[in-house]
A protein has these predicted regions:
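Conserved SGNH/GDSL esterase-like catalytic core that processes O-acyl groups on lipids
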Residues: 1-97, 133
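Surface-exposed, active-site-proximal loop segments in enzymatic domains
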Residues: 76-86, 120-127, 166-167
């Protein structure tokens, strides 16, 4: 049976009354894959780089066939009108280092990067916000890095862009219907990689 490791933020694991795509992905994978994941939000790219070796200790890292990962929504977060936490060049560097770390820790695994999903800008209140322009910019950085490093990419931004507003739980998270649709797309992309042995 194939072994899959999931690394991502609250779009993966849920938050504030939402489920996230992971439970739906696990359900679709029953009988075909065993999914492993950290029991915490993996946050921004530098946080994932710092902690992924600890998360790898909780799974059979040497037997993982596919790592599905995303970092981005935490990276583009603006607080009190400031710029995103890491500037673009730092996001680029952290992704490169994260890919190298994943390849070190999961030596037999193929990698699948998920771009960050769009936000509903009008729903932000308070000092923090995200913009779709920032998300597009950082997704473009990620796609460029992954292409250079030979990592497969699933454009979840494109998948979620035309979701009905009823599938949005809040400014960034999804209802079960939205999370199920994300899981369907991830399952299809992941299965294609596993079936081709990439």
């Amino acid at each position: 049976m194939k072994q899959v490791f999931l690394l991502g933020d609250s779009i993966r694991m849920g938050n504030q009354g939402t489920t996230g795509y992971e439970p739906f992905l696990r359900q679709k994978s029953l009988g075909a894959c065993v999914c492993h994941s950290p029991q915490e939000n993996c946050q921004f790219a530098q946080y994932a780089l710092r902690h992924v070796h600890q998360w790898a200790e909780d799974c059979p890292a040497g037997e993982i066939d596919l790592v599905i990962f995303n970092c981005g929504l935490w990276d583009v977060l603006r607080m009190f009108g400031d710029d995103p936490l890491p500037p673009p060049e730092v996001y680029d560097l952290m992704l490169r280092r994260l890919v190298a770390r994943l390849r070190l820790l999961f030596p037999r695994a193929a990698l699948l990067f998920l771009t960050s999903t769009p936000t509903v800008e009008a729903r932000y209140t308070g000092p923090s916000r995200r913009t779709n322009d920032d998300i597009r910019q950082y997704n473009a950085i990620a796609r460029s890095v992954m292409e250079e490093l030979g990592v497969a990419v699933l454009d979840l931004f494109a998948v979620a862009r035309d979701f009905p507003l009823a599938w949005r739980h809040d400014h960034v998270h999804y209802t079960d219907a939205g999370s199920q649709a994300l899981a369907d797309a991830i399952f299809a992309a992941g299965t294609a990689i596993l079936n081709t042995g990439e």
